[in-house]
Every structure is written in structure tokens, then in C-alpha cells.
A protein has these predicted regions:
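Conserved "HGTGT" condensation-loop signature of ketosynthase/thiolase-family condensing enzymes
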Residues: 1-79, 112-164
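Short glycine- and Lys/Arg-enriched binding-loop motifs that mark or flank ligand-binding interfaces
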Residues: 10-12, 84, 107
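Aromatic/His-enriched, Gly/Pro-containing loop or helix-boundary segments
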Residues: 73-94
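Short, glycine/charge-rich beta-strand/loop segments that flank catalytic centers
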Residues: 83-87, 110-115
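Hydrophobic or amphipathic alpha-helical targeting/insertion segments
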Residues: 96-110
Length: 164
């Protein structure tokens, strides 16, 4: 049986985004509240009007409480997801499938990361089960090594790849 997707069952009706920059005056919870408030206000809602939330984060929180507390959500499920560099996409995918399944009428996916407040100099090299070899490269460093090889393999100009 082939999949026909969910594009006719789900609509993205709003979005919000804080500026990509160093926010020395704000914490991760402030950025999350700003993005969610911007998103809901654009369609005349408040955060508690949403049925369920999916929070995508890696370094900024270990549970859905990272969203539930600052947003003052009462009785709303918040699921935290993490999928390395696809964390935001994973949150959106889960929220979309929750609506498509009929479990919820409205769902909101939100991603937040603020690594420098936690003492990091940047995203660290995530540990996962391996052969025991110490990993020393961060995700960004690994991708910077892969990008030129990808460009050569697929005949893409590296300048075009940099603009993505």
C-alpha cells in the first residue's frame, strides 16, 4: 500500500520566528514565548487555544516543561523531540501527523536553542554509542567537511551551496 501523504489533511496557518542573532538579553524561554506569541497572535489565538505542542530542542531543555512553564499552558500536552539537525522538522512532522490522525484539531511545533547561556562555546559533539573512539568534531564542523565533497559529487557550484 503506497502512502499518499497528509497534505490534504493539514494546513499550516501561521508561523513566527525570532531574529537569528545573539540574544544576550533573553533566555531560551523568552525566545520560545516570543515565537509562539507571534505565531498565535497572527491568527487571533493565544497559546492556550492550541490543543497540543511539539517542542524541538537539544541543548535548551530535557522535557516539555521547557515550553509548558513559560507559556503557562494548563492541561496541554507538550512533547519534546530531538533529532540532531532535523529537530525542528521532527517537531513539525509530529504536530502535522497528530492533526492528520484526528487526535487534535490544532497543534503547534516550536523549536528553540540557546547554547551559550549554558556555558557552551557552540554546539557540542553529541555522544552516541560507537566503538569508543572519541569524537572531536561538532555537527557544524562535520558538515563543513562534507559540503565540498557533496558539491563535487553532484556537480553543484560551492558558491550556490553556500547560499542555501
Amino acid at each position: 500500500m503506497s502512502s499518499h501523504g497528509i497534505s490534504d489533511q493539514v494546513a499550516i496557518v501561521s508561523m513566527g520566528c525570532t531574529p537569528f542573532k545573539e540574544h544576550w538579553d533573553k533566555g531560551a524561554d523568552d525566545l520560545l514565548v516570543d515565537a509562539v506569541t507571534q505565531t498565535t497572535a497572527a491568527v487571533g489565538l493565544v497559546p492556550n487555544d492550541i490543543d497540543a505542542y511539539w517542542l524541538g530542542t537539544s541543548q535548551s531543555g530535557a522535557s516539555g516543561m521547557m515550553a509548558a512553564g513559560p507559556l503557562k499552558l494548563e492541561g496541554k500536552p507538550v512533547s519534546r523531540v530531538e533529532n540532531y539537525c532535523a529537530t525542528g522538522s521532527e517537531a513539525l512532522r509530529n504536530a502535522a501527523y497528530a492533526v492528520a490522525s484526528g487526535a487534535y484539531d490544532t497543534a503547534l511545533a516550536v523549536g528553540v536553542e540557546k547554547v551559550k547561556d549554558g556555558g557552551y562555546q557552540g554546539l557540542n559533539a553529541f555522544p552516541y554509542p560507537t566503538d569508543g573512539t572519541q569524537r572531536t568534531l561538532t555537527a557544524a564542523a562535520m558538515f563543513s567537511l562534507v559540503a565540498p565533497a557533496y558539491a563535487r559529487r553532484y556537480g553543484i557550484d560551492e558558491d550556490d551551496l553556500r547560499r542555501v
